[in-house]
């Protein structure tokens, strides 16, 4: 099998002449195929040291006709895609350099992405990173944060917000009728809208284990602040549980969930006397 010929000047005269004859014949054959298959105008003028007479293709008249059509175009159109060997090579080098830089950027982004997840998982110690890695990681994180912020803005523009997120699993809202008196700031709130067609619905979302988490969080805080747990504030959640609550003493409605709750009301005409009096 013949190997690929090296693209360089052939020093041997006889080999160079033989190569010229073969390549010239093959090139003229390609010209003929191009004109026949594609229906384009083409011509060639070959001048070589092996023949004192220039060789026009397909003929002298054919060359003059094609050149006359070519000269009818403006200078800008004629030179738009015209390049010499040096310009062609420079264009190829610039294109390959750009492609190489693009591949390097992609590889670097993959490395920084792996580095970011390694830091989040605790597999990489940030204090061991060098200056370039820290700078690239900073740029990468800012880029992702900007993407997240932009995504939030798009969701807000489309009418979607965090309030549309469904409640956590296992925390089912309790719905009660508005006719049941609700305690608010030590006083009673009654439905003042007599013409209301549908009852108002209140939703309670209980924060389970809220009180159970307070001692642990206080203990963790004391440990971080190096405070003696014996000297810390003693929190007793049962203090005052026997004291009477004015709004609940004569109320027949006692929720089974005795913990902090958030109240969500539908739009209605509900009047809070204590707020109106304060205003």
UniProtKB/Swiss-Prot annotation:
Q: Which CDD domains match?
A: MADS_SRF_like
* One BP term from GO: positive regulation of transcription by RNA polymerase II
Q: Does the keyword Nucleus apply?
A: yes
Q: What is the effect of changing residue 230 to D?
A: In strain: cv. Co-1
Tissue expression as described in the entry: Male gametophyte, embryo and endosperm.
Gene3D superfamilies assigned to the protein according to its UniProt record, in alphabetical order = Transcription factor, MADS-box
The protein's GO terms of the molecular function aspect are:
cis-regulatory region sequence-specific DNA binding; DNA-binding transcription factor activity; DNA-binding transcription factor activity, RNA polymerase II-specific; protein dimerization activity
List the subcellular locations.
Answer: Nucleus
Q: Name one GO cellular component term.
A: nucleus
Alphabetized UniProt keyword annotations: DNA-binding, Nucleus, Transcription, Transcription regulation
Q: What induces it?
A: Repressed by MEA, FIS2 and FIE in seeds, and by PKL after germination.
List the SUPFAM superfamilies hit by this protein, alphabetically.
SRF-like (SSF55455)
Q: Does the keyword Transcription regulation apply?
A: yes
Effect on the protein upon substituting residue 76 to I = In strain: cv. Bla-1, cv. Bs-1, cv. Ita-0 and cv. Kas-1
Q: Where is the MADS-box domain?
A: 1-60
Top-level taxonomic group: Eukaryota
Q: What else is known?
A: The PHE1 locus is imprinted in gametophytes. Maternal inherited gene is repressed in female gametophyte, while the paternal inherited gene is expressed in the male gametophyte (pollen tube) and in fertilized seeds. The maternal repression is dependent on MEA, FIS2 and FIE proteins, which may modulate the methylation of the maternal locus, and repress its transcription. This protein was called 'Pheres' in memory of one of the murdered sons of the mythological 'Medea', as PHERES1 is repressed by MEDEA.
Q: How does it assemble?
A: Interacts with AGL61/DIANA and AGL62.
Record's function text: Probable transcription factor involved in the development of gametophytes and seeds.
Q: What is this protein called?
A: MADS-box transcription factor PHERES 1
Which species?
A: Arabidopsis thaliana
């Amino acid at each position: 099998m013949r190997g690929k010929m090296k693209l360089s000047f052939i020093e041997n005269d006889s080999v160079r002449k033989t190569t010229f004859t073969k390549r010239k014949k093959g090139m003229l054959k390609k010209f003929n195929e191009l004109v026949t298959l594609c229906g384009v105008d083409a011509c060639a003028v070959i001048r070589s040291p092996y023949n004192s007479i220039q060789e026009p293709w397909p003929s002298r008249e054919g060359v003059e006709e094609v050149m006359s059509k070519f000269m009818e175009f403006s200078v800008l159109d004629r030179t738009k895609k015209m390049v010499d060997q040096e310009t062609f090579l420079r264009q190829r080098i610039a294109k390959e350099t750009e492609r190489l830089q693009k591949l390097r950027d992609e590889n670097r982004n993959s490395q920084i992405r792996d580095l970011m997840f390694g830091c989040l998982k605790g597999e990489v110690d940030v204090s061991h990173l060098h200056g370039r890695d820290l700078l690239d990681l900073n740029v990468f994180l800012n880029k992702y944060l900007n993407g997240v912020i932009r995504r939030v803005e798009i969701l807000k523009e489309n009418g979607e917000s965090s309030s549309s997120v469904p409640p956590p699993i296992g925390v089912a809202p309790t719905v009660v009728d508005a006719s049941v008196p609700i305690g608010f700031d030590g006083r009673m709130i009654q439905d003042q809208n007599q013409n209301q067609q549908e009852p108002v619905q209140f939703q309670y979302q209980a924060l389970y284990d809220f009180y159970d988490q307070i001692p642990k969080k206080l203990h963790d805080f004391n440990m971080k602040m190096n405070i003696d747990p014996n000297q810390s504030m003693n929190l007793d959640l049962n203090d005052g549980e026997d004291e009477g609550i004015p709004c609940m003493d004569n109320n027949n409605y006692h929720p089974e969930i005795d913990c902090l709750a958030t109240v969500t009301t539908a739009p209605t005409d509900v009047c809070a006397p204590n707020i109106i009096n304060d205003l």
